[in-house]
Regions:
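Membrane-embedded catalytic cores of phosphoryl/pyrophosphoryl-handling enzymes
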Residues: 60, 90, 100, 104, ...
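Generic transmembrane alpha-helix motif of multi-pass integral membrane proteins
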Residues: 76-82, 142-146
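Hydrophobic transmembrane alpha-helices of secondary-active transporters
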Residues: 72-80, 249-253, 315-319
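Interfacial segments of alpha-helical transmembrane regions
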Residues: 80-99
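N-terminal transmembrane-helix/juxtamembrane module of multi-pass inner/ER membrane proteins
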Residues: 3-73, 87, 103-126, 260-262, ...
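Short, flexible segments with low predicted structural confidence
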Residues: 35-36, 77-78, 152
């Protein structure tokens, strides 16, 4: 019970910037270790990228491009939500939702073609500009970099985005202009989400007492996604439904925020347990939604991903009470 009470008080550390990513001042060793780990991961990614460029290996390009796939964002967002900072985790999901919704619309506005299909090394659909993988990854990583202001995280962000962007060109599904456009729009979305949700506008839009997630961003994502479908766009039908459902599920976050913040400031074993449980449930549900969509229709992605998002929040919220009360 003592651990439970201490963890309950710990969520207040959000307003001081204290988290697993930002250790308390004076804890220089832990801070340096975090940067060292992040930079080491960046080095591994950079080496793999270099080898891919030199060998032009399709397998390596596919491995690097997987860093920008849907499953990667599910795992990474849950990791931030449960292990580091609950509000930052939700903000990262909002960045993915906003950027993913916007790129569907941008592709139709610019209507620029991809490289010839005969050159493709993996299946692709829709127009080429901007690169969706590149834009969404840039939004996700730039938001986290702005939030935590760590050198190691900034280095990792650059390495991941560079790897994803280069892999899209290496797989011949995008031109260089496409990935550069994705980076530009991704930075814009990441900066806007940071400013509105975790930066200067947070107090105004979210409400300082409970740190409510700005309602405007999920609503905007739903509107853009639905419009992309109503306009008969040739790209992004399934993605539109997924993003819309996920965005609506995040409206429940203000109701569960305090409990989820307890998890992100709980002892390491509790946080890891929460991360594993939430990730397993989320991945199982997303795979189940694919089977259901094949049997019923792509529209089912909307309610399915609403359920996925809501389940992520509920599991993360329940983990502290299920574990800490037994300690």
């Amino acid at each position: 019970m003592g651990l439970w009470l201490r963890a309950l008080k710990a969520h207040a550390a959000f307003d001081t910037g204290v988290s697993a990513m930002n250790p308390p001042e004076g804890d220089d060793r832990k801070s340096l270790l975090v940067d060292y780990v992040l930079i080491s991961i960046s080095a591994v990614i950079t080496v793999l990228l270099t080898v891919a460029v030199v060998t032009d290996s399709t397998k390596l390009w596919l491995a690097l491009t997987s860093l920008g796939e849907e499953s990667a964002y599910v795992v990474l967002s849950i990791a931030v939500l449960t292990l580091i900072d609950a509000d930052a985790g939700v903000a990262s999901l909002l960045a993915v939702i906003a950027s993913g919704s916007l790129v569907i619309w941008l592709k139709e506005v610019f209507a620029l073609p991809r490289p010839p299909e005969a050159l493709w090394r993996e299946p692709a659909e829709g127009y080429g500009f901007p690169s969706g993988h590149t834009q969404v990854s840039t939004s996700f990583w730039s938001l986290l970099s702005l939030k935590f202001r760590r050198v190691g995280l900034a280095v990792l962000s650059v390495a991941v985005v560079a790897a994803i962007a280069t892999s899209r060109v290496g797989l011949h599904v995008h031109y260089v202009r496409d990935v550069l456009g994705g980076i530009a729009f991704g930075l814009l979305v990441g900066a806007c989400v940071w400013a509105l949700v975790v930066g200067p506008g947070r107090r105004f839009l979210m409400g300082s007492p409970v740190n409510r997630v700005a309602l405007a961003l999920p609503v905007l994502s739903v509107v853009v996604s639905v419009l992309s479908f109503w306009e008969g766009y040739a790209y992004g039908f399934d993605t539109s439904f997924k993003l819309g459902g996920l965005a609506l599920s995040l409206l429940a976050y203000p109701l569960l925020a305090q409990r989820i913040r307890v998890l992100s400031h709980a002892p390491a074993t509790v946080r890891v347990s929460g991360f594993i449980a939430t990730t397993v449930v989320a991945l199982v549900l997303t795979e189940a939604s694919k089977l259901l969509a094949e049997a019923v229709g792509i529209w089912v992605y909307g309610p399915a991903y609403f359920f996925v998002g809501l389940t992520i929040l509920v599991v993360a919220a329940l983990t502290p009470s299920l574990i800490l009360k037994r300690l």
